[in-house]
Amino acid sequence: GSEMCIRDRLNGKVSAAINRKLSRNFRQNGVEITPEQWTVLLFLWEKDGVTQQELCNATFKDKPSMTRLIDNMERQHLVVRIADKRDRRTNLIHLTKTGRELEGKARFIANKTLKEALQGLTLEELKVSQDVLRKVFTNIKD
């Protein structure tokens, strides 16, 4: 009952606070991306030239949200849509030079932000909390 509600709010608050901090740290260091764009870039730095559907699956976003996100990232010259050679109807999302060059700085800032967020926690505490969140996710994912 109310316990679940408190936990939901806490988790929501925690991730919202981390995202705000990440946004601020990006901005203050001249990296003009949102936390949502960060998750897309993170995936593309590992595996470039993927379908929009792959990005949806990786980031748990729906099609319309992802379309908007990619549109904005295209306007910022971070990514470009290129028709798939095997299937002209499908666009593959590729990093631009700008998108690739952002990686070092953005990862550095994100790691710094994470360190700030996790300061004072022991490795054991982190491990337990990850295990707990993994179990919760496993319980509720479709």
Language-model features and meaning:
Residues 42-43, 57, 104, 130, ...:
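A cross-family signal for key residues in well-ordered alpha-helices
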Residues 16, 20-65:
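N-terminal helix-turn-helix DNA-binding core of bacterial DNA-binding proteins
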Residues 71-131:
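Charged, amphipathic alpha-helical coiled-coil/dimerization segments
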Residues 1-5:
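Short, small-residue-biased leader/transition segments that mark boundaries at the very start
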